[in-house]
């Protein structure tokens, strides 16, 4: 345990491995939340970036292996698994997406599997990866968070990528004029041109808030659920370090019970992120909403 107190232990496990410019002007790693905050916008969460890229590569490698080994005869276990995943996502897209785009199904599959893998890291005991980072670095105080989706920077980045696609397809399908009209002529309208002009600011305010709420809610929903789940695992780990036999025994029971329940959470959150992406992009392909 890198920190001596329970509060210090919790804070240590909730801090990212942050690299940026220190107050003295040099570049290095932050060893406290205050140092990380002082680094400002151009601070890099290397643990989030590293795990996100690594899990993305694992996803690509697994599916590439399945594609190369695919046969029309008796499929293997990996091919069966990939086919089930593809059929599941393809069915979800057909049920929820009402436009035509060859990008949506691959995007939905990528989002579901990638988010699921990032969430699944939360099932690894909370001390294992941070302790490995300490052994490799030789620094007993270095923080390291392995669950990328407990970092709001990661979830917001994914959500705003989806938001960029929403804007792109809205303009592509409806035209720039149609997109602007969608923001300014709805939900209130009038046959009187003068009244309609007066309603434009009201419509724009309502539609803009609705539009910008999509990526924010998408990101914060995933972050909030995964952060809460990670915090519960950390609190259970504190029980093991309490020194009380009965509390440690309770921690064992809670650890397994929460891990089993958390399997549902990590799968459900990946599914929700994927489905909302499909729905938002379907709305972008529709002429009216």
Curated annotation (Swiss-Prot):
GO annotations of cellular component type: plasma membrane; proton-transporting ATP synthase complex
TM segment ranges: 43-63, 104-124, 160-180, 193-213, 232-252, 259-279
GO molecular-function terms, A-Z: proton-transporting ATP synthase activity, rotational mechanism
Subcellular location: Cell inner membrane
InterPro entries per record: ATP_syn_F0_a_bact/chloroplast, ATP_synth_F0_asu, ATP_synth_F0_asu_AS, F0_ATP_A_sf
Subunit structure comment from the entry: F-type ATPases have 2 components, CF(1) - the catalytic core - and CF(0) - the membrane proton channel. CF(1) has five subunits: alpha(3), beta(3), gamma(1), delta(1), epsilon(1). CF(0) has three main subunits: a(1), b(2) and c(9-12). The alpha and beta chains form an alternating ring which encloses part of the gamma chain. CF(1) is attached to CF(0) by a central stalk formed by the gamma and epsilon chains, while a peripheral stalk is formed by the delta and b chains.
Sequence similarity: Belongs to the ATPase A chain family.
Protein name: ATP synthase subunit a
UniProt KW keywords: ATP synthesis, Cell inner membrane, Cell membrane, CF(0), Hydrogen ion transport, Ion transport, Membrane, Transmembrane, Transmembrane helix, Transport
Gene name tied to this protein: atpB
Top-rank lineage group of the source organism: Bacteria
Record's function text: Key component of the proton channel; it plays a direct role in the translocation of protons across the membrane.
Record's bilayer topology term: Multi-pass membrane protein
Main location: membrane
UniProt GO BP: proton motive force-driven plasma membrane ATP synthesis
């Amino acid at each position: 345990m890198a920190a001596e107190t329970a509060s210090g232990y919790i804070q240590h496990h909730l801090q990212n491995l942050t690299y940026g410019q220190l107050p003295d002007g040099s570049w290095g790693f932050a060893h406290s939340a205050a140092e990380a905050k002082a680094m400002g916008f151009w601070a890099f969460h290397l643990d989030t970036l590293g795990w996100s890229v690594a899990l993305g590569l694992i996803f690509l490698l697994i599916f590439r292996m399945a594609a190369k080994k695919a046969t029309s005869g008796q499929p293997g276990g990996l091919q069966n698994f990939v086919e089930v995943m593809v059929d599941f996502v393809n069915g979800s897209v057909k049920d929820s997406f009402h436009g035509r785009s060859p990008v949506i199904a691959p995007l939905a599959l990528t989002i579901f599997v990638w988010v699921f893998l990032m969430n699944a890291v939360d099932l690894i005991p909370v001390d294992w990866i941070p302790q490995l980072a300490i052994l490799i670095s030789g620094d007993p105080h270095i923080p390291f968070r392995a669950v990328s989706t407990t970092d709001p920077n990661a979830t917001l980045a994914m959500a705003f990528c989806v938001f960029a696609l929403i804007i792109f397809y809205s303009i592509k399908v409806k035209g720039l004029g149609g997109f602007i009209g969608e923001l300014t002529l709805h939900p209130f309208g009038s046959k009187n041109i003068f009244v309609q002009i007066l309603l434009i600011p009201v419509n724009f305010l309502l539609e803009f808030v609705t539009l910008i709420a999509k990526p924010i809610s998408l990101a914060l929903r995933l972050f909030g659920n995964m952060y809460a789940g990670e915090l519960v695992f950390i609190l259970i780990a504190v029980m093991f370090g309490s020194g009380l036999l009965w509390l440690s025994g309770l921690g064992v029971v809670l650890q397994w019970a929460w891990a089993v329940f958390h399997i549902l959470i990590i799968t459900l959150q990946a599914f929700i992120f994927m489905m909302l992406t499909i729905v938002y992009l379907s709305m972008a392909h529709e002429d009216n909403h």
